[in-house]
Amino acid sequence: MRILFLGTPSFASEHLEFLIKNNFDVVAVISQPDKPKGRGKKVQPTPVKEVAQKYNIPVFQPTKLTSEGLSIIERYKPDLGIVVAYGKLLKPPFLNAIPFYNIHASLLPKYRGAAPIQRALENGESVTGITIFKIGEGMDDGPIALKKEISVGEFETFGSLYEKLLSLGKEALLEFLNNYPPNLYPQEGVPTYAPKISKEDLELDFSADYVTVKNKIRAYDPIPGVRSVLKGKIVKLFQVFYVEADENIKEYGKVLKINNEGGFISAKGGIVGIKYIQFPGKKPITFLDAKNGGLVKEGDKFES
């Protein structure tokens, strides 16, 4: 079975390397064009391109996928395409040239779109998973080939859930290819969407419900991290370890207590325990270290 692989970030490159190491015949790879990254704004190859080059697999980065993609298919004659976080919608006639299947990090039709892991955490989902589906002309709306579920812990972070879904995605991909072609069935249920992360999404407001605060911190931990303001400085907060309902709280964002577990902050309807705080230009440190360093104390208040 000859495979054309399309993908861009590290979530995709891990799946590509998994295919190669399991001796699947990846005949060509398509990735997004390289972009400037980091403080120096140097142009760097995409993670998928790096893996393709490592294994000497032909890799292409077309700016116009429909026309250039057809010539790639004509040249390498793949039987199917595997798509993982490529970053662009596939359109006819390229889309119709071979069957394309997408590995998506949610239980479709929930969380169609670019940020399914973050949005599932933000909404406090207790279950999520991987869906492999045949790509149609809409966004993540094609018939399903395979679904795999995974539970989400109360204090699960983006980082930990990402790793679990990466492992589950590889498992699902292996099962899918070993049983190809699949028996497809339509998506059922009301679709929900997972739009790209905006700067506004990262702003933490302690006047929101305490469970909402907990979930927002988890959704962007460890990257890029939610932001709040303390004593006029923009800080980031990481690793929620505790929540408790308290309807008597009237002041939001107040540091109620700091101990070796972390900082306990008031929010609407309850208290949120947070382990790490990051000050501008510094690495994250525990709340206790920040207290001992004179950076934060009980009674201080976070502003939204």
Curated annotation (Swiss-Prot):
Recorded catalytic activity of this chain's protein: L-methionyl-tRNA(fMet) + (6R)-10-formyltetrahydrofolate = N-formyl-L-methionyl-tRNA(fMet) + (6S)-5,6,7,8-tetrahydrofolate + H(+)
E.C. number(s) listed in UniProt: 2.1.2.9
Binding site for (6S)-5,6,7,8-tetrahydrofolate: 106-109
Molecular functions (GO terms): methionyl-tRNA formyltransferase activity
Coiled coil, from the record: none
InterPro entries tied to this protein: Fmt, Formyl_trans_C, Formyl_transf_N, Formyl_transf_N_sf, Formyl_transferase-like_C_sf, Met-tRNA-FMT_C, Met-tRNA-FMT_N
Keywords (A to Z) from UniProt: Protein biosynthesis, Transferase
Cellular component annotations (GO), alphabetically ordered: cytosol
Enzyme class: transferase
Protein task: Attaches a formyl group to the free amino group of methionyl-tRNA(fMet). The formyl group appears to play a dual role in the initiator identity of N-formylmethionyl-tRNA by promoting its recognition by IF2 and preventing the misappropriation of this tRNA by the elongation apparatus.
Family listed: Belongs to the Fmt family.
Protein's name in the database: Methionyl-tRNA formyltransferase
Gene: fmt
